[in-house]
Amino acid sequence: MKEMEVRAFKDDIKKYKGKSVAVFVYEGDLKPLARLSKGTSNKAKRVAELENFKGKEGEILKVPTLGTSVDFVYIVGLGKKEKVGEDTYRRASANLVKRMRRDKVESTVVVIPRRGDVSKEITKAITEGAILGNYRFDKYKSKKEDEKFEIKEVLINRGDEEGIRLGKIFAEAQNYARNLVNEPGNVINPITLAEEAKKLAEEFGLECKVYDEKQIQEMGMMALYSVGKGSATPPRFIHLIYKPSGKPKEKIALVGKGLTFDSGGLNIKPGDYMRTMKMDKSGACAVLGIMRAIAQLKPDVEVHGLIGAAENMPDGNAYRPDDVIKAKNGKYIEIDNTDAEGRVTLADVLSYASELKPDKIIDMATLTGACMVALGEYTAGLFTNAPDFAEEIKKTAKRTGERVWELPMDDERLRKKIKNTVADVLNTGGRYGGAITAAMFLEEFVGEGIKWVHLDIAGPAWSKEEYGYYTKGGTGFGVRTCLEYIMKVSSNV
C-alpha cells in the first residue's frame, strides 16, 4: 500500500487543475470561496446557499463544479471563528480525508480562510489530521475494504514545508503507537514488545537495552517480576536512549505501562472486562512512538524511554493477594488485589527512572477505571508533584487536542488509605478516589527533587467509536503532547 502524500501547493489556487478543492470556512462566512476561479466560486456558493450550509464544525458539503477547473469542491466547516484553534484544523482535515475515502477521491488541495502563507502550526495540524484520519488497522482482514482504492495526496495551498515535515513525523509516530496497541496478546507479548523496541532502535539510531527475567530479578525489580511471573511469557524491562550531539538542555524520562494483556491475575476479571485488555500496553506503545519521532526530530534534550513489559495471568506461580514484594527502591508493597498490577510494575520502572537523575519524569498508564468514572472516556487524568510542570503539560495538551484534567493529590486522608498495611504501601486505596490513591502510590517511587507528571490514560487510550481523527481501537494518546513538550524544551520557547 502506497502511503498518502501531504505536500504544499505554492501557486495561486486559481491555477490548480485537479479532481477537487477543499475550502475550509468559518461558520456563516463563505467568503473564502471567492479565492477560487470565478466560475467555480459562483457555483459552490450558490449550492451552499441552496443547501443552507452553515459552516458548523464537522459539516462538509460536496458541490459538483463540472465545467470549471475542478470537478467538485468540498466546503469544510470550522465552526465559529473565535473558537477555532489548531485542533479544529486537525479535526477538519481528518474529517475531510474520511469523506474523501468514502467518495473514493484520490486527491485534493486544502484552502484555509486566512489569506497568505499558512503558518507552520496550522500546516502541521492539517498534516497531522490528514494522516491520522486516513489510519486503518486492517492487517487481519483477508479481504480489505476498498482494497483497490487509496488516497494519493492532500495538498495544502501555500502550506509551510517545515510544518508538513513535523506533522508527518508526529502523526506517523502516533499511528505507529496505534498499530502496536491494536495488536492482540498472542502477537505482542513482553518478549515480542522488547524485540519491537530493538528493531525500532536499530532502524532509527537509538540505544536500546533489554533485560530478561533473570536480569530483572538481579536488578531488584521484584515488583515487575512478580506481576509477570504467572505468565508463560516472562517479563522484560526495556530502556531506549536518545542523546543529542551537544550538551542537553534537560534530561527527561518517559515511563510507559506495558501490560501486553491483563486478565486480572488471580483476582481475575469478568469476561466483559477482560475484552480489549490488549490495550493495557498503551502507555508503553506511546513511549515507543515518541522515541521513534525523537530519533528523527533530534531535539537538544536527552530522552529515556522506559517500559516494564509483563502479562498478568493466573497460574500456580502467579503473585497473590497478601503477598509482600520489595520494589527496586527498597520499599515494600503489600498486594491487596492482583488486578491493580499496573502500579506495581510502574513502581520499579519509576524507581529505575529516578536513578537516572532526570530533570523530569512523565509516566503514561492505562491505570484506573476510577479515572474514567471521574473524567469520562475522552480525558486523561493528570497528577503531579510539580505545579509548574503540570501547567506546561496542560498548555501543550490544549494545543495538541489531547485532553487532560488535573486531579488533586493534597488530601492526606486519601494517602492514609494506601498506608493501611503491614508493609510500606498497599496497592489499592479503597473504592473512592481510586485514580488519586493510585497516583499517590506511584509517587512513593519517584526520587526526591524530580519533577513528575503522571497521566492516567485509561479512558482516551482506547476509542469505542470513530470521531475526529480517531477510529475505533487504539488512539496513541499522549504521543503528540509529549513530543510537543520535548520540542518546546529543546527550543526554549
From Swiss-Prot:
EC numbers on record: 3.4.11.1, 3.4.11.10
Positions that bind Mn(2+) 1: D262, D339, E341
Catalyzed chemical reaction(s): Release of an N-terminal amino acid, Xaa-|-Yaa-, in which Xaa is preferably Leu, but may be other amino acids including Pro although not Arg or Lys, and Yaa may be Pro. Amino acid amides and methyl esters are also readily hydrolyzed, but rates on arylamides are exceedingly low; Release of an N-terminal amino acid, preferentially leucine, but not glutamic or aspartic acids
SUPFAM superfamilies: Macro domain-like, Zn-dependent exopeptidases
Subcellular location(s) of the protein: Cytoplasm
Residue positions binding Mn(2+) 2: K257, D262, D280, E341
Required cofactor names: Mn(2+)
Keyword Nucleotide-binding on entry: no
InterPro entries named among the record's database cross-references: Leucine_aapep/pepB, Macro_dom-like, Peptidase_M17_C, Peptidase_M17_leu_NH2_pept, Peptidase_M17_N
Record: active site: K269, R343
Co-factor remark: Binds 2 manganese ions per subunit.
Cellular component terms (Gene Ontology): cytoplasm
GO biological process: proteolysis
Gene Ontology MF term list: manganese ion binding; metalloaminopeptidase activity; peptidase activity
Record keywords: Aminopeptidase, Cytoplasm, Hydrolase, Manganese, Metal-binding, Protease
Protein task: Presumably involved in the processing and regular turnover of intracellular proteins. Catalyzes the removal of unsubstituted N-terminal amino acids from various peptides.
NCBIfam families, A to Z: PRK00913.1-2 (NF002073), PRK00913.1-4 (NF002074), PRK00913.2-3 (NF002076), PRK00913.3-3 (NF002081), PRK00913.3-5 (NF002083)
Membership in a protein family: Belongs to the peptidase M17 family.
Protein name from the UniProt record: Probable cytosol aminopeptidase
Taxonomic lineage from the root: Bacteria, Pseudomonadati, Aquificota, Aquificia, Aquificales
Gene this chain is encoded by: pepA
